[in-house]
Amino acid sequence: MGDEYLAEPEDEVAISMWPENIGDKHQKQFKMEKLGKDQDALEDANFQQKPSSVDLNRLMELANSEKGVSQMQYFVKHWEYKRANTARLLKEQIGLLCQQRKEIEQRKQQILEEQQFQDESYYAVKWQVPILDEVYKDEWKRPSKKNDDLSHNQELKIDAEYDSISYWKERAMQLEKTLEASLQRERSLEEKLEENIKNLQSHTPVEEFSGMLKRADYFLHLVLQSAPIVIAHQDADLRYRFIFNHFPTLADEDVIGKTDYEILSGEGIEEMNNVKKEVMASGKATKREFVFNTPLFGAKTFVTYIEPVFSKSGETIGVNYVAMDITDQVTRREKMADIRVREAVQKAKETELSKSLHITEETMRAKQMLATMSHEIRSPLSGVLSMAEILATTKLDKEQYQLLEVMLSSGDLVLQLINDILDLSKVESGAMKLEATTFRPREVVKHVLQTAAASLKKELILEGCIGDNVPLEVTGDVLRIRQILTNLISNAVKFTHEGKVGINLHVLDKQLPGCRIEGGQLHSKAHSAPAAAAEHFSASPRKCDNDTLGCSNHEDACQTGIPSNDNFGEHHEGDEVVWLRCDVYDTGIGIPEKSLPLLFKRYMQASDDHARKYGGTGLGLAICKQLVELMGGTLTVVSKENEGSTFSFVLPCKIPVKEDHSDDPDDMPSSGGDFTTSDIEGSFIFKPQARPYLLTSGVSVMNNTKLIGGNQFYDPPNILEDRKPFSNGFVLAEDHSTNSASTAHQSNGPSVSRTNKEQHDNAMVIELNRQAERVSSSRGDTTSVSGLIHDERGPCRVHEEKSLHKKSKCSPSSNKAKILLVEDNKVNIMVAKSMLEQLGHGIDIVNNGLEAIRAIQKRQYDIILMDVHMPEMDGLQATKFIRSFENTGCWDTSVKPEHDQIIAGSDNLSDCAHMKKQGKRVPIIAMTANSFSESAEECLAAGMDSYISKPVNFQNIKECLQQYLPPQ
């Protein structure tokens, strides 16, 4: 027997089932194996002997809850496990005790036998027989436990000193007591376990659990009824086997066993069934939106989740789906999408508006720069040209007149360049406004040819041919059409040394290719400018051009332009539109083919040699092309070098509708009175004749266009229509031989006496000056009348012109008109004063608007010539004060309060009693160097009657006074 002891595992914690004092005496003798971890079950099974207090309400609350039910079920299972485990452990302990008892008895028997053997064999060898070997071996034959593996290979070794009978007797008694205590404890545990099981069965909350389930089911139904959904199950044939329908339209018995086709009809049913079939075929769930429109519940949108249902074998046996009504959400979603689209559109519009505003600001700055340039150049140029005209009326020798002629021509060239640049800038920036008026194409062609003939120095024939299908009157922008014709005729005359120059006007049978009229609007594919032409036209009658505005409330209407209230660029369905084709041809030097592509570009000419030899700025044709495209037409050229050129443009024009009450020719508005034979003539020819003598004027013909009172054209006096030869060597040959010579046209110009040869010639010179001045803005020719008429003696004096100015003066001083000149520039004051004095009128001069108001308060005037830009108070503000007083009889202090102290007071009212008494409207004529039409519109809006652009000449002043002054 060895001294080794069994090693006790450190990680094993076991509670001994033996009494606590069992090892006190023999702790030093034996090292016994501790029981396994299964012994913990016995410890867990201990119950308190003392009853404890229980909160029954809390217990019932926990038992009635879902968690309590779960815990109760777990508790029952746990106690069943504990009971089984305890019984097993007790059986194991009892078996072990029995085995140990048997070993003790065997040991006891061995001891007795050994004692007897020793007595019998005193002299024999004593063998030591281990008394516990069989017991130890039998010990490990018992059923093994899970915690007994630690002691399988260990042997119990007992010291020899403890191998005595008394020890084992005592040991056996202790084991007996321990076994009895264990059995008693087992019986106690069994009793308590049975008691707990009985208590658990008697207190099982079956009714509470049933109530909980009912409440949960009710709550589930309540949730489903509150949610707008449909839950259903369909079999493989898509027949309903279960459905919970939120919508009370159908009962369950109306749905169960039927398909969707048997229940509903309308939009969306077939689509949903196809998706269900796809889910069953693919075995994959899906979510879709379906739009239904059925007679049962109307238009609805559902979002549906569909999933397949599988059997145990994996076959698809149906589908489950959940559908929710999202009609309101879809409506809100569409509204939100619409709002987002609107916001995007609004943002794009704001961006575009910002860009347009930026472009507009840039355009306005450029336009303001051009206006400033025009004003700054025109102001000193006005002094030069006006003083030159005044100087031409004085006594000068031949050389002085020639120098003066060069001065006037050069000044006119500078003025023409300014006008071309301004016209081009207005067209390109979109500021050019086209205004529709009713005019007569024949008169326009005839007047253009007359003006060209008046300034012609070459042996050329000017001819015009008007087609029979051309209407007598059409509606269009007559000023721009005349500007285009004049520019083309001027170029033709300039580049033609011999032969003829002519205009051919006719109506096209078909409209221009690439252009169409849809919805009353003109469209052009070839040009982008005509498409926007309607935006540049005004519905108001023409009141002004680039230089002069006329008041529409005067009876002196234009002879060839009749105001119209229709927009030029807008053609209504009932309007008749004709396409006029105008060909301007010549037999001149022609244009090289390589130069044709560059012909209509700005500042470009056929060649540098042409530019040096013939002059010009290269802007005329560019302006013509843009004006034609702006009016919705096209401009083309056909030319062959050394054979001539033909410029052709096509324009849409509307035929004016005659009113029923205007059948009488006398009531119909006309530019020259009633229709005559000359109004419908089809051709004009201006042929050169012998040069009788020279007549010079010293006054430039090609000056800026000056239109007073809306007179866009001036019909020349009868000297141009009576087949009598002109003094400049040209005669008008007409196709009609009757009634043309006797027809007399009324005009705003001075009457011509046919009995006085000198007056006849002088009147013709002035008339040609007037005609030429009106088209100078569209031409580059700066030739004056003094260079048009030749004499056999060569250049001579201009005493006839001077005598004409002297005769035009008002001889009786008592009939002088009282004129107020409001001007701050000393040079302009000198010019206007000199011209008015030569015309025989008195003049008062003030330097700003405030002084003008003081002068009007003290004296009555027949006409006021007022500058626009002046210090202290400009002409526009002063005009508003004057018009306000004329309308109300008192000075309106609300127009500009800061000037109240100057125009208020009782003295002022008494001083102006003459104006209030007569109720007279004093004509106010604007005089400014700003040639933009917006400036003219501002003048008219302020109350001015007309507009004269600087530089001012005798003809402007004279026409203005003739129109607005009362007859002397």
From Swiss-Prot:
The modification 4-aspartylphosphate is found at D867. Residues 372-655 form the Histidine kinase domain. GO terms for cellular component: plasma membrane. It comes from the Eukaryota. Residues 89-120, 169-204 form a coiled coil. It catalyses: ATP + protein L-histidine = ADP + protein N-phospho-L-histidine. Disruption phenotype: Dwarf, chlorina and sterility phenotypes. Pfam families: HATPase_c, HisKA, Response_reg. Residues 737-757 are annotated as: Disordered. InterPro entries: CheY-like_superfamily, HATPase_C_sf, His_kinase_dom, HisK_dim/P_dom, HisK_dim/P_sf, PAS-like_dom_sf, Sig_transdc_His_kin-like_C, Sig_transdc_resp-reg_receiver. The modification Phosphohistidine is found at H375. Residues 738-754 have a biased composition (Polar residues). Histidine-containing phosphotransfer domain (HPt) contains an active histidine that mediates the phosphotransfer. Cytokinin receptor related to bacterial two-component regulators. Functions as a histidine kinase and transmits the stress signal to a downstream MAPK cascade. This is Probable histidine kinase 1. It comes from Oryza sativa subsp. japonica (Rice).
